[in-house]
Amino acid sequence: MALKAQNTISGKEGRLFLDGEEMAHIKTFEANVEKNKSEVNIMGRRMTGHKTTGANGTGTATFYKVTSKFVLLMMDYVKKGSDPYFTLQAVLDDQSSGRGTERVTLYDVNFDSAKIASLDVDSEALEEEVPFTFEDFDVPEKLSDTF
C-alpha cells in the first residue's frame, strides 16, 4: 500500500515528560545516538575498515522561558556540587495519522549547560536551549510498521 499524506506525523502532536512531569513549555526536542568507531586497516584493502566500539547519546531541548528550573539546576551544581540525572520521555501521538503512538524513554539524562540570563528586545517569546547527554534509551511503544 502507498503512503498517504494523512499518514505523516505532525511534529506538533507531541509531549515531553521530565521524571513523569509534563514539560508543557517544550518547543523543540531532539535526541540522537551516534556510534563510536575505530578505524581498522586491513591488509590487501585500500579502504579503511571501521569497528563499532560503543555509542554516545546526546540531544537538545528548546523550551519557552517560563520557569527558572534550568538556571536553578546549574546553580545547585556550581554552589553545592549537586548534579542530578533524570528520565525524559518523548511522546508522538498524532491521532489523525493512523500510525499509533511512539514513546521514546531516555535514561540517565544530564543537562550540559543552561542560559542563566537572557534579554531580547526583539523577542516575542524568550526561549532557552538546553543540551544534554543520556546513557540509555528504550522504545516502550512504537509506531505501526504497516500501512
From Swiss-Prot:
Kindly give the InterPro entries that the UniProt entry links to this protein.
Answer: DUF2001 (IPR018989), XkdM-like_sf (IPR038628)
Annotated transmembrane regions: none
The record's section on SUPFAM superfamilies has: Phage tail proteins
Q: Which family does it belong to?
A: To B.subtilis YqbM.
Q: What is this protein called?
A: Phage-like element PBSX protein XkdM
Q: Which organism is it from?
A: Bacillus subtilis (strain 168)
What lineage does UniProt assign to this protein's organism? Bacteria, Bacillati, Bacillota, Bacilli, Bacillales
User: By which gene is this protein encoded?
Assistant: xkdM
